[in-house]
Amino acid sequence: LIAGIFFYASSLISVRDWGFQYLCCMGQHKISYQQLFDLAKAILQKIGCSEKDAELAVKVLLSADVRGIDSHGVARLSGYVRLWEVNRINATPDINIIHQTPSTAVVDGDSGLGLVIAPWAMQVAIEKANNVGTGWVSVQNSNHFGIAGYHAMLALGYDMIGIALTNASPLVAPTFSIERLLGTNPICVVIPAGEGPPFVGDMATTTAANGKLEILQRKNGVAPLGWIQNKQGRSSTNPHELKAGGALLPLGGDKEHGSHKGYILGSVVDIFSAILSGANYGPWVPPFPAYVPMPEEQPGKGIGHFFGALDIEGFRDKSEFKENIDEWIHTMRNTKVQP
């Protein structure tokens, strides 16, 4: 019931000006950040999350909404609730390290919210980097973790470089294939700067993230060529083809436009996130929609993530590095633009 009520509003929420607006049959309504935060927090506590975990999870979701990334914000909340309803999300997980060295670790998320597990694991990577220069953490037995950028940006608070990867539900066909064998498998790299804002690169390894297709499906929109293919393997602009057996395409769209490079990037994310940790990989990654049956075979545990933190002082003087990053960003931002 909670999921059903919230889905209608959350699936259409977006950021406008200083508040959030959602559309309904009676027109537009604006609610504040705090109102939305309190509502989402109450829903997560209702399913059994502690106040601390609920607040963290909502903070991760709203960090997407305030950046205009509607596909990864509170629109996802109903999906998490439905996964809890079918016992695929543990609201009170016992997150723990199952293997570690001074610079590496494997974390078991105990089927908890990825929104909670990911920051926990990233903090482990940061602590290791603080001790020995770099920290690398692979995670098993987790779930969808929201935007990768939130977790990687935690490193900025320590003047470190942050990295976050995750595998995802198999919706992507490798180059030349008609089978959905990989997820959108995003990569995020965050680099601190000096005077200016940091470098934050957060992207799917597909031409478009699944959330973008979901938005087009709700609006009956048209997808650009190179985003998806139908179940016969032909390029399509109909976003509903994805639900009819089609697939998302690797970054590049097709071989002629470099999709093999996107295929490689997505594969690397899958290997680092899952095979390195003992999570499920490839076509065996658990689907995000609760109504989609779980794969019959489960070679690993849950969804996998991978996090990294690098202490700049382990490579060179931090102030000199930041000065160079500022110069680099200035150079790129002041390039001559196309006419």
List where the protein language model places each region.
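Catalytic-core signal marking the mid-to-C-terminal active-site face
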Residues: 27-31, 36, 271, 280-339
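Phosphate/diphosphate-binding glycine-rich loops and adjacent basic-rich segments that engage nucleotide
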Residues: 172-242
